[in-house]
């Protein structure tokens, strides 16, 4: 099943998404497929979006953040061991997780991320689709940033994948106000830097993803407004290697 089929056929998932649940879609991509905002030297080329909620939604101190995440993941791993006989095999293609502060919902998120940890070494790109709390959008908005920064380090954005979804040329810059070209895979996608600047829903997922998927991670951060799954084009980012999608 593809993401759009699940949204069409699963009312519980649809209602959870409307209620503000964070949706994280993860695709398995090779290093060549998951082109990022890094140049040949591995350096980030472009603007880096700094952490907006470190120190409030999660610890700003790197050591304290790692300790908290590992504590929450350990709890999730223990629960998964008990559930192992009933779980599908393989790496999940998508998980639904909350986006509150870690002391409130981190343990619930950690259960999903402990399951996603199966993909460490094979999953190199995470597509993070979340709601907006500060700057509303119509459609699905990608960022103008080349990377997102957290206390655990800087994660490159897969700008090449965003350009493809928007129907842009290879070297066309991502400027706020840009809309998808006619016939683009994601017709409702736009570029909107301000909606990402202070938004926490996507950001709070990144430290967990850095921890469970490792240093080769790239991300596609998306803020979702009014758009159908088909218009948003999330399926475009999933690639050709499909697996079962458990929704948590």
How should each PLM-predicted stretch be described?
Residues 1-34:
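Generic low-complexity, intrinsically disordered segments
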Residues 12, 16, 32-35, 62-63, ...:
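Short linear sequence elements within intrinsically disordered, low-complexity coil regions
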Residues 42-248:
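Active-site histidine-anchored catalytic micro-motif
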């Amino acid at each position: 099943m593809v993401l759009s089929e699940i949204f069409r056929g699963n009312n519980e998932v649809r209602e959870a998404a409307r209620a503000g649940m964070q949706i994280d879609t993860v695709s398995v991509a090779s290093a060549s497929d998951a082109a990022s905002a890094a140049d040949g030297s591995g350096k980030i080329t472009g603007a880096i979006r700094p952490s907006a909620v470190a120190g409030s939604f999660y610890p700003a101190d790197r050591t304290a953040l790692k300790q908290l995440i590992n504590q929450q993941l350990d709890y999730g791993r223990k629960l998964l061991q008990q559930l192992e006989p009933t779980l599908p095999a393989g790496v999940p293609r998508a998980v639904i997780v909350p986006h509150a502060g870690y002391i409130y919902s981190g343990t619930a998120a950690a259960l999903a991320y402990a399951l996603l940890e199966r993909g460490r070494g094979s999953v190199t790109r995470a597509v993070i689709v979340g709601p907006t709390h500060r700057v509303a959008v119509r459609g699905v908005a990608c960022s103008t940033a080349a990377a997102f920064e957290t206390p655990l380090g800087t994660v490159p954005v897969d700008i090449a994948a965003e350009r493809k979804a928007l129907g842009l040329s290879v070297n066309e810059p991502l400027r706020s106000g840009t809309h998808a070209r006619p016939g683009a895979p994601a017709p409702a996608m736009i570029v909107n830097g301000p909606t990402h600047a202070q938004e926490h829903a996507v950001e709070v997922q990144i430290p967990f993803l850095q921890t469970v998927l490792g240093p080769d991670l790239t991300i596609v951060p998306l803020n979702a407004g009014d758009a159908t799954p088909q218009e948003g084009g999330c399926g475009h980012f999933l690639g050709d290697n499909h697996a079962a999608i458990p929704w948590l």
